[in-house]
Amino acid sequence: MIIIGGVIVVLFLLMIGTHVAVALGIVTAGMVLLTDGVPITVIAQTGFKSVNSYPLMAIPMFVLAGNLMMKGQLAHMIIELIGTVVRVLRGGLALTVLFTSVFFAAVSGSSVGSAAAIGAATVDGLRREKYPDRFAAGIVAVGGTLGLMIPPSLGFILIGTIVGLPIDRLFLAGIVPGLLEATLLMFSVVFLSHKYNYGTVAKTADFRGFFTKLPKAIPALLMPILVLGSIYAGIMTPTEVSAFAAVYALLIGLFFYRTISISGAWEAARDSLLQTTMIYAVVLGGSLIGFILVRMGVSAHLVSVLEQADLSWWQFLLIVNVVLLVLGMFLDGVTLIILTAPLLFPMAQVMGINPIHFAVIMVANVEIATLTPPIGLNLFVMSGIVRIPVHEVARGVLPFYVVRLFGLALLTFIPQLSLFFE
């Protein structure tokens, strides 16, 4: 009864505009007071332990790296380079958006940050080539979600920290699924562009322009190679490489491209601090409510119910996907991971599901959550950039939403895609 009441209170607080972390903190405090044998001091102790984590230190640095790339206008450079050869195809500029999304995903690990950076760099160009506003907003919004799957993913960092999985293995697991998702989106862009005659088509690929622009783009192109290569070569941990990424982005922006000023770097640092504070606040609030749920035996009870239900592994995963998709309508990605991971991973273990595979499934659901009304953050980001209503952005996302659901099904029922490097 306490749990049901807590859920109702959380939903009410969110509906009236209370910040997620505050809502979770209020409900947790109430549940602690109503639960026998749990001292109130446990709130401070558990909250501190939840954010006093070495792996979580990677989050502010990766966020800063993404913001510095955005301030340094690196998206413009990558778009111009790729566009010289890709725009020979129908829908070439939209394809360029997706290629650039993959690049940003391999550096920042943030969905919203990628969508904001790429949207600011491409929307005017998409409009000039007569792409409808809602299609332009939709393709950038859905491309931004790749930042959650392709390493270094903030989602994988959170999951690894919460359930104790190696973050470098989670990063490896996200490579094939991320590239698969990008490929499916590219095919859908080509199909829709041909069907509705979107965009202009260059007569020939501009290879001269490509090789002219390539030398200048090399420092930016090296960034994801250095970031991921350092992790997988064992040179740096994910936390260490996050700091390297931020410093590298700052140096090439200040001294090589000269597109970042001191004031711009300060703004990037300030924005990163605000974004990280919000993430940490949700981590703190979610860990508190997760602790009390475990203390009340909710996780153990769910495992017991699951053992008696006699479900097959695929039936369990189907139910999990439905639950996460529904919750994704009302919770942002960080909150969704923090609230559900402590409950779902023990259940997945009972079903004999590889935890790395299950982590990929969870991140794939979080990607879709960022596109799902009424909370989908990428919808609001693109609504602000393109200056169209959120429901119009949602209409633009709809064809790609179907593609993402198909991709989710593939990742769910073909574990080898997630375990390719295991």
Label each PLM-derived region with a short phrase.
Residues 1-422:
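Alpha-helical transmembrane segments of multi-pass membrane transport proteins
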